[in-house]
Amino acid sequence: PDDEVASRNLLSEWIEILERDRNHPSIITWAPLTVPLSNVTSGTFARLVFDLQKLTKAIDPSRPFNDLTGSGFHFLTDIWSISTYEPDATRFALSLKPDKNQAAYANQPFIIGEFGGIVWETSRTKEDTWGHGGTFTNEDALFERIEKLINAIQSSGIISGFCYTQFSDIEQEKNGIYTYDRQPKFDMERIRSIFKKIPSKPIKK
């Protein structure tokens, strides 16, 4: 959206979306933009983000606004979110903080919108297997990877919540803990014992 006309069109469409969906009970946060591919520091893009926030709060002040979900680059947001598929637990832990070169962090809830993406490969899925965070054929090694990532989140001291990628396989991605038709892939009690760990408390203001 470095294009002025495209930005104005998006704002008009966004108003229609807000008015159509603001009473829908499943919507918990407004997130109009995701990881940007354009120049986020341009004046046109920055103005678009601020206009989206102003419109959203005017039409529905009851919900949080997340300006650039998952990007870690924020202008004006109620929720600070990042997405990372870093597989190494040590490097993953280091990424769980606001980047000092980005917008000033103002103690918003810090959310990991996406992480994990680990593929469980079987002979049946080998020809059609893809994911974000590496491929495993050894179940114990896969559980170890997941648990190390969860431990890093738990000990971060800043994370308010997280979303693992992902609940179930989809057409092109085989990194779910359930299959496409919602059948468990693993010992779900073992999965539960990892994911039930309580995230760390957010930083106090």
Residue ranges and their predicted role:
Residues 1-182, 190, 195:
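Substrate-binding/catalytic cleft of secreted carbohydrate-active enzymes
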Residues 186:
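Histidine-centered active-site microenvironments of extracellular/periplasmic hydrolases
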Residues 193-205:
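Surface beta-strand/loop "capping" patches
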